[in-house]
Regions:
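Extracellular/periplasmic catalytic domains that process cell-envelope and extracellular macromolecules
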Residues: 32-33, 50-52, 59-60, 122, ...
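Short beta-strand segments
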Residues: 36-70, 87, 97
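Bacterial N-terminal signal peptides
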Residues: 5-14
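Short, basic/aromatic recognition patches
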Residues: 23-34, 38-39
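Positively charged n-region of N-terminal signal peptides that target proteins for export
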Residues: 1-3
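Covalent nucleotidyltransferase core used to form phosphodiester bonds in nucleic acids
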Residues: 29-31, 66-79
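Sec/Tat signal peptide C-region and signal peptidase I cleavage site
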Residues: 15-19
């Protein structure tokens, strides 16, 4: 029953996104995805050169997509972005964005990003009360550089 409910929810969301028609520009894409819970981040493997796909939490802020790497930045996708900062984001409704990644190191900005994640994601907020570092990873700004075909 849970699987059926989840499948129905995905179908409804996908149908609603598709009903809005094609994405006109980057601003339109950001507006459509901002309330989604996850997005697919597609990086190029730093060792293999192959496509590496990872669903990831994100926040849209100031026309940029913000993501965070857990494990103190020792995740494949984060290390891939350090080597090749150009990536692709895929979202529900056939939304595709080409992005350029920049790690965030300014302490004030990092703390602000952590607050945005805790505000958007209840799970991170609840776990933070128990000492979890979820929602407090190494932040990366993904600046949209255009819509993508694939």
């Amino acid at each position: 029953m849970r699987v059926l409910a989840a499948a129905l929810a995905v179908t409804v969301v996908a149908g609603a996104a598709a009903a809005k028609g094609p994405v006109s520009d980057v601003r339109d894409a950001l507006e459509r995805i901002k309330d989604d819970s996850t997005i697919e981040l597609v990086t190029t493997g730093r060792k293999t050169g192959k496509e590496h796909v990872r669903p990831i939490w994100f926040v849209v802020d100031q026309a940029k997509i913000l993501v965070q790497a857990g494990k103190d930045g020792k995740t494949d996708w984060y290390l891939n972005l350090l080597k090749n900062p150009e990536a692709l984001l895929r979202a529900v409704g056939n939304i595709r964005l080409r992005v350029r990644a920049t790690p965030v190191t300014d302490a004030k900005r990092v703390e602000g990003i952590h607050r945005l994640f805790l505000r958007k994601y209840m799970t991170a907020r609840l776990l933070s009360w128990f000492g979890s570092s979820i929602g407090r990873g190494k932040p990366v700004e993904l600046e949209p550089i255009g819509l993508a075909d694939r």
